[in-house]
Amino acid sequence: MPTINQLVRKERKKIIEKSKSPALKNCPQRRGVCTRVYTTTPKKPNSALRKVAKVRLTSGFEVISYIGGEGHNLQEHSIVLVRGGRVKDLPGVKYHIVRGALDTAGVAKRTVSRSKYGAKRPKK
């Protein structure tokens, strides 16, 4: 514990919070253009072909974003909406593509958690 004299000489340092999604520049989402759409494999205990896209954002950053849900219609030059949120088993993937916004279609035949995948309510 410092003395009052020590605090007068040198004040306490503020803890600077580091953003987990710096490419969004403090915005909730950002628009971007897909430069490459491909699949990649996850880290050690898991095994799959995860769908990801390299996206050039309006903020100037080029980021790797995860495409959630079953099936997608994205290709190069698709305009997408990107939100934050990392994928734990894919190193370097710190963003998600929002389904059902801009050029991204919602997930077809989705009945639960529909709002997360841009799916409309099914007809009775």
Swiss-Prot record:
UniProt keyword Hydrolase present: no
Family indicated by similarity: Belongs to the universal ribosomal protein uS12 family.
MF term (GO), any: rRNA binding
Descriptive protein name: Small ribosomal subunit protein uS12
Organism: Campylobacter hominis (strain ATCC BAA-381 / DSM 21671 / CCUG 45161 / LMG 19568 / NCTC 13146 / CH001A)
Ribonucleoprotein in keyword set: yes
Signal peptide: none
One GO-annotated biological process of the protein: translation
Positions where 3-methylthioaspartic acid occurs in the chain: 89
Family matches, as PANTHER family: 30S RIBOSOMAL PROTEIN S12 FAMILY MEMBER
Oligomeric form and interacting partners: Part of the 30S ribosomal subunit. Contacts proteins S8 and S17. May interact with IF1 in the 30S initiation complex.
GO cellular component, one term: small ribosomal subunit
Pfam family, one: Ribosom_S12_S23
Keyword terms of this UniProt record: Methylation, Ribonucleoprotein, Ribosomal protein, RNA-binding, rRNA-binding, tRNA-binding
Function field: With S4 and S5 plays an important role in translational accuracy.
